[in-house]
């Protein structure tokens, strides 16, 4: 997911998408349009044909390639009764699930920590949150008696539970345990 996001062009770098569409009427049917190529975080422009460079030189000058990998996980995704099996039990990577409720003060305290961990371990683990008010069946199935509770799953199997608003290091230690084969 992060790799796909890293290769997308921002709206200011719409040379290959919107900008090309708006200038298609200037090109001959046999003309080639060269768009920026991805080379890390630097932009690189292949040689432009004379028809493209003469029709819109400024368009290429102000465009830029933007890596959106840091935005791949903006927030932890919700999981519910209908998505639980697919996202948690059938996941090919370890899963961390935060059981929470909107009225829970300690849940609000740990939420930013869960968000940070989701960003730090993006692509290595899947991180979800489950609102116990909206999915009480799953909370009951896994004996969730206090919130926040964080459960860890690997290969669809429950491995560990951590109860309460714990320090980030406690969760990090648990994540690291399940990353090794």
Curated annotation (Swiss-Prot):
<feature type="domain" description="Thioredoxin">
    <location>
        <begin position="68"/>
        <end position="180"/>
    </location>
</feature>
<keyword id="KW-0150">Chloroplast</keyword>
<feature type="transit peptide" description="Chloroplast">
    <location>
        <begin position="1"/>
        <end position="67"/>
    </location>
</feature>
<dbReference type="GO" id="GO:0005737">
    <property type="term" value="C:cytoplasm"/>
</dbReference>
<dbReference type="InterPro" id="IPR017937">
    <property type="entry name" value="Thioredoxin_CS"/>
</dbReference>
<keyword id="KW-1015">Disulfide bond</keyword>
<keyword id="KW-0676">Redox-active center</keyword>
<keyword id="KW-0249">Electron transport</keyword>
<feature type="active site" description="Nucleophile">
    <location>
        <position position="107"/>
    </location>
</feature>
<feature type="disulfide bond" description="Redox-active">
    <location>
        <begin position="104"/>
        <end position="107"/>
    </location>
</feature>
<protein>
    <recommendedName>
        <fullName>Thioredoxin M-type, chloroplastic</fullName>
    </recommendedName>
</protein>
<feature type="site" description="Contributes to redox potential value">
    <location>
        <position position="105"/>
    </location>
</feature>
<dbReference type="GO" id="GO:0015035">
    <property type="term" value="F:protein-disulfide reductase activity"/>
</dbReference>
<dbReference type="Pfam" id="PF00085">
    <property type="entry name" value="Thioredoxin"/>
</dbReference>
<comment type="function">
    <text>Participates in various redox reactions through the reversible oxidation of the active center dithiol to a disulfide. The M form is known to activate NADP-malate dehydrogenase.</text>
</comment>
<keyword id="KW-0934">Plastid</keyword>
<keyword id="KW-0809">Transit peptide</keyword>
<keyword id="KW-0813">Transport</keyword>
<comment type="subunit">
    <text>Forms a complex with heterodimeric ferredoxin-thioredoxin reductase (FTR) and ferredoxin.</text>
</comment>
<feature type="site" description="Deprotonates C-terminal active site Cys">
    <location>
        <position position="98"/>
    </location>
</feature>
<dbReference type="InterPro" id="IPR013766">
    <property type="entry name" value="Thioredoxin_domain"/>
</dbReference>
<feature type="site" description="Contributes to redox potential value">
    <location>
        <position position="106"/>
    </location>
</feature>
<dbReference type="GO" id="GO:0008047">
    <property type="term" value="F:enzyme activator activity"/>
</dbReference>
<dbReference type="InterPro" id="IPR005746">
    <property type="entry name" value="Thioredoxin"/>
</dbReference>
<dbReference type="GO" id="GO:0009507">
    <property type="term" value="C:chloroplast"/>
</dbReference>
<dbReference type="InterPro" id="IPR036249">
    <property type="entry name" value="Thioredoxin-like_sf"/>
</dbReference>
<comment type="similarity">
    <text>Belongs to the thioredoxin family. Plant M-type subfamily.</text>
</comment>
<feature type="active site" description="Nucleophile">
    <location>
        <position position="104"/>
    </location>
</feature>
């Amino acid at each position: 997911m992060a790799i796909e996001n890293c290769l997308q062009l921002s709206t200011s770098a719409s040379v290959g998408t919107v900008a090309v569409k708006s200038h298609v009427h200037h090109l001959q049917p046999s003309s080639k349009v060269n768009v920026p190529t991805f080379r890390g975080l630097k932009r690189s422009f292949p040689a432009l044909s004379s028809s493209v460079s003469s029709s819109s030189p400024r368009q290429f000058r102000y465009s830029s390639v933007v890596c959106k990998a840091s935005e791949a996980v903006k927030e932890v995704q919700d999981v519910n009764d209908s998505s639980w099996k697919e996202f948690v039990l059938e996941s090919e990577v370890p899963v961390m699930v935060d059981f929470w409720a909107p009225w829970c003060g300690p849940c609000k305290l740990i939420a930013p920590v869960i968000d940070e961990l989701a960003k730090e371990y993006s692509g290595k683990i899947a991180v979800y949150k489950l609102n116990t008010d909206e999915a009480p069946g799953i909370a009951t199935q896994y004996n969730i008696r206090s919130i926040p509770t964080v459960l860890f799953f690997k290969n669809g199997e429950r491995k560990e539970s951590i109860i309460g608003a714990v320090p980030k290091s406690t969760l990090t230690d648990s994540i690291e345990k399940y990353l090794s084969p």
